[in-house]
């Protein structure tokens, strides 16, 4: 009887992903009116995400399912909550765009693809088998290729094709690494590989396979020098889709790398892996900082900023994955997600141009201080937070990430990261100068007038809650870090 009940519960857990997808497809076919169809699908998708979060919350802390192919820990549950929360906010922003008739409108096919990518990413985080990891990553990647392809824009088509080509190369490298490990060990399960790797720490085929898998994941993440395609993809995909791709890719890739490190990499020649990773991190920090300093388009600046933040997030892998580094990195990731969410809410729901378009170029921020001082102050606070200026919370989270490397003896890495952070701050301060000081001259052509709204139903709540976190969360820093530490200790 107990076994029957467990099987029934497992069927419910597995079907919670598939049944909503079938329902969404049926709704997209059966409802004829476009606006009504998209609205119903959005509401169904929001409800589905809430149900999935509830199911994840009532699951056991640590358990294995599907005969060891998937595993769930408290850290994985935290990352899944972050993924579902970000996805819910993205769907909400798309809903606001559909309601107001903005350029952020999305089709029913796009919503189904977003949900399909969420399924793939959830499975990727829980994957405890290399072939399961590969297939789940491909599910989300195929959806990303189509979502990034904006057929109404030349840059969107170009970026989508680049994403597809680079994604294919990354997939090939990833699959080659899996084949190399399977040829050497005869298994794809993490538990089996763990025993074999501990007995054969110097097997070059295992080391090469792990290196290829990590390289494929880094290529998908856009770490320098494999970053050029990422900028064009984000510019063509649009602001909201850039937000979705930026956050979700970081969450999934970081969780997959953590799983790989704890189950495989830590028992191999970790020194070689660490040295190679440090070189990539240093190159990424330099390229991301220099690239962001010369950007005039807001979305390209966000893309370069995302590259820098990716380097800071994978720093914990170069620090032997100590508990302190993991806790601080997760805290930094949460701060980054909240800061970027507030920035996107400002751009999409609070700041817009009078022609009902969204802000795309930096110069369009001119006169904001004159038009609406309150909106300008909020925008400046968010920019200062993302720049990591004291006393903002993001400054503390950066300090928490970098200082442990002083103890580990990697002073050069810490000092270079601090130096490059100052370079990024200079650009953020230039944005503040544009908002407060610069004024639109009468002879400038093509400068649309900025309109600032303060409707609480259009992103206002997200902005208020986000700004409160940016300013006041440091008052409860010890409590927040202790909660994260408990979660990390349970993996």
From Swiss-Prot:
What does the record say about its membrane topology? Multi-pass membrane protein
Q: Quote a single Gene Ontology cellular component term.
A: mitochondrial inner membrane
Q: Which EC number(s) does the record attach to this protein?
A: 7.1.1.2
Q: Which UniProt keywords apply?
A: Electron transport, Membrane, Mitochondrion, Mitochondrion inner membrane, NAD, Respiratory chain, Translocase, Transmembrane, Transmembrane helix, Transport, Ubiquinone
KW Disulfide bond (keyword) present:
no
InterPro entries (UniProt xref): ND/Mrp_TM
- Report the subcellular localization: Mitochondrion inner membrane
Q: What is its main location?
A: mitochondrion
The membrane spanning regions, by residue number, are: 11-31, 38-58, 74-94, 106-126, 129-149, 161-181, 210-230, 238-258, 270-290, 298-318, 330-350, 375-395, 411-433, 463-483
* Top-tier EC class: translocase
Q: Does the keyword Membrane apply?
A: yes
What catalytic activity does the UniProt entry give for this protein? a ubiquinone + NADH + 5 H(+)(in) = a ubiquinol + NAD(+) + 4 H(+)(out)
Pfam families hit by this protein: Proton_antipo_M (PF00361)
Q: Name one GO molecular function term.
A: NADH dehydrogenase (ubiquinone) activity
Q: Its function?
A: Core subunit of the mitochondrial membrane respiratory chain NADH dehydrogenase (Complex I) that is believed to belong to the minimal assembly required for catalysis. Complex I functions in the transfer of electrons from NADH to the respiratory chain. The immediate electron acceptor for the enzyme is believed to be ubiquinone.
Q: Which family does it belong to?
A: Belongs to the complex I subunit 2 family.
Q: What is this protein called?
A: NADH-ubiquinone oxidoreductase chain 2
């Amino acid at each position: 009887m107990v076994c029957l009940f467990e099987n029934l519960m497992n069927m419910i857990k597995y079907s919670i992903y598939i049944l909503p997808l079938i329902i969404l497809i049926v709704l997209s076919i059966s409802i004829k009116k476009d606006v009504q169809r998209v609205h119903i699908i959005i509401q169904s998708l929001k409800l589905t995400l809430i149900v999935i979060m509830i199911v994840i919350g009532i699951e056991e802390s640590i358990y294995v399912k599907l005969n060891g192919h998937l595993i769930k820990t408290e850290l994985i549950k935290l990352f899944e909550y972050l993924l579902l929360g970000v996805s819910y906010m993205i769907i909400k922003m798309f809903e606001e765009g559909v309601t107001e008739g903005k350029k952020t409108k999305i089709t029913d096919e796009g919503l189904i693809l977003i949900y399909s990518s969420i399924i793939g990413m959830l499975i990727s985080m829980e994957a405890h088998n290399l072939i399961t990891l590969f297939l789940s990553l491909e599910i989300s990647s195929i959806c990303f290729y189509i979502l990034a392809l904006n057929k109404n824009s030349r840059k969107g088509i170009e970026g989508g094709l680049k994403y597809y080509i680079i994604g294919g190369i990354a997939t090939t490298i990833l699959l080659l690494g899996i084949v190399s490990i399977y040829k050497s060990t005869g298994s794809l399960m993490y538990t089996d590989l763990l025993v074999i790797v501990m007995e054969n720490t110097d097997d070059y085929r295992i080391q090469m396979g792990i290196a290829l898998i990590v390289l494929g994941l880094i290529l998908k993440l856009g770490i320098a020098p494999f970053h050029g395609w990422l900028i064009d993809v984000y510019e063509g995909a649009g602001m909201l889709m850039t937000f979705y791709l930026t956050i979700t890719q970081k969450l999934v890739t970081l969780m997959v790398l953590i799983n790989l490190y704890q189950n495989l990499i830590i028992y191999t020649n970790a020194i070689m892996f660490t040295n190679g990773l440090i070189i990539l991190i240093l190159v990424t920090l330099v390229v991301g900082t220099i690239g962001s300093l010369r950007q005039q388009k807001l979305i390209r600046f966000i893309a370069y900023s995302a590259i820098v933040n990716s380097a800071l997030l994978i720093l914990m892998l170069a620090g032997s994955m100590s508990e302190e580094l993991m806790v601080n990195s997760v805290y930094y990731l949460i701060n980054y997600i909240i800061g970027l969410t507030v920035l996107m809410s400002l751009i999409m729901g609070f700041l817009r141009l009078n022609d009902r378009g969204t802000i795309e170029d930096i110069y369009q921020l001119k006169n904001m201080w004159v038009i609406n001082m309150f909106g300008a102050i909020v925008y400046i606070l968010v920019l200062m937070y993302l720049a990591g200026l004291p006393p903002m919370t993001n400054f503390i989270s950066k300090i928490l990430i970098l200082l442990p490397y002083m103890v580990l003896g990697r002073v050069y890495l810490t000092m270079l990261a601090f130096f490059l952070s100052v370079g990024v701050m200079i650009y953020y301060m230039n944005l503040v100068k544009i908002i407060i000081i610069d004024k639109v001259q009468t002879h400038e052509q093509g400068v649309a007038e900025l309109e600032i709204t303060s409707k609480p139903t259009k992103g206002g709540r997200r902005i208020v809650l986000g700004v409160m976190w940016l300013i006041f969360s440091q008052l409860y820093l010890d409590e927040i870090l202790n909660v994260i530490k408990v979660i990390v200790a349970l993996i």
